[in-house]
């Protein structure tokens, strides 16, 4: 399918699932989805040609548990109002197992195809067990809003392949149910990996590669269990990487590069002095060597000065 998103769909008020992924829809994601389809639990529009911004009306979908807008051309910032997605922000424990409640009538069971933990899995289970948000591979800019940390019911989060900047919000570490902080990779994030990430005890997938992150990788059973590839393309140190840190938490190779640069400045100072001497010396000698008339004049002058000096010295002795 291609073209615009059909507006006739807004008449299906009882819809709880829209999956129009891998089509050729274009234009903006319709704002009326949040206005009219208030019972939506799953919204998957991945792998289309949607552009424009994420409509703030999406934040009105209080039952939404699976939002997938990945692989489109969506720009703008991540809406701060995402913390209003109450089904992603609420947890209930039943027999020590965490579920997310989204309707008073109970939990709806659906056969849902979701992209989770870096692979496609088909779940015959309550939707409350697979709450996820994937807005990867777009052109989103700005910072990750700290309000994302309120979505404590999320099990999977993927913001990779955008143009996001700034620090990673510390309160993402409060999302202790997170199993798959699938990807913050391939952005322009800076600062440190928040120490609170050591609280994410259920993580089985994690990737912050190819950003501008610096400092130490927080110590936890989970964070040290991932491969180096989860951290490459940054300026990080400590296990699982082989780079050690200085006492200030700076990777040693970065610190050494700084020292090398300072040493290079000193070396260049000496080099410039030597070059200055050589250039000055040859600036005087080269004309005498190559121009015969200058050479003869120089020797006559030198002979004249020598004779004059000798006469002065001899006169002083008398």
Q: Each predicted region: which residue ranges?
A:
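Membrane-proximal ectodomain caps of single-pass cell-surface receptors
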Residues: 1-318
